[in-house]
Amino acid sequence: MIDKISRTVVGRMRLLLAAVEKERVKRRPLLINETRFSRDRWEDSIICPTDFYFDCFQFFHSGFEKRLRDHRFYFATNGRGFGEDAFHVLWWMLLQVLRPKTFLEIGVYRGQVLSLVSLLQGILQINGTVTGISPFLPSGDSVSKYRSDVDYRDDTIKNFQHFKLPDPDLIKAFSTDKSASDKIRSGKWDMVYIDGNHDYEVAKQDWEICAQNLNRGGIIVLDDSALNTEYRPPAFATGGHPGPSLLAQEVDSSRFNEILRVGHNRVFQLIQ
């Protein structure tokens, strides 16, 4: 009983400290503009990942397009999505520069990233599609637990409808299922976001099959993969989880270049 009370108190203190730091950073003067995030500045995110993360966070709150902020606020409400505010700036950068026509997400949850990519495709006039592979069940892993009172597939579709987006292509399967691997192999992908099971063995399998089915110059964004890097997350962010972080360390640098980091999301591009 005492241990449970102690954990509750510690958890609430962490949330309070995170909220205080978040407000402090939001109130800093904005000293950057959109040029900070142009393609020729992405190397800064590798060299100084913590500073770059703060720039993304501040830009989201002070200079970002309102409809993209509104999208994040919608998913941040009532537990509709995880992630961090700065990640919306990450996807905006990627879509602006790389303009993916075929996008695949492994691990959809309730559709925050999948719908954001669809929204950005519309804003940027990219004639593209979005595909999601997910069990759409409250299935967790060694580091994640999910609500059991949500129909995740139906909820994802409703969230797309809320933003008046085209219906996504949703595959109800674990990424290790044959139907999922068949879908991944069915074409070539411009961009893949791996955010499914965070256990190393599963994340590695996801990486390997996706890496084999990328277009030339294709992208893999690896979630929760910045432990053991120079990135030092603030109290309102995280560095990721051990499984994806170990996987990121093992990426073959003769096949992939790391081109961008925002927080615990790391972006790798297939060398042409």
Which residues are covered by each model-predicted region?
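Membrane-proximal basic amphipathic "stem/tether" segments
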Residues: M1-A76
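N-terminal pre-P-loop "Q-motif" helix
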Residues: G83-F87
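S-adenosylmethionine/decaboxylated-SAM
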Residues: Y74-T77, H88, W92-Q272
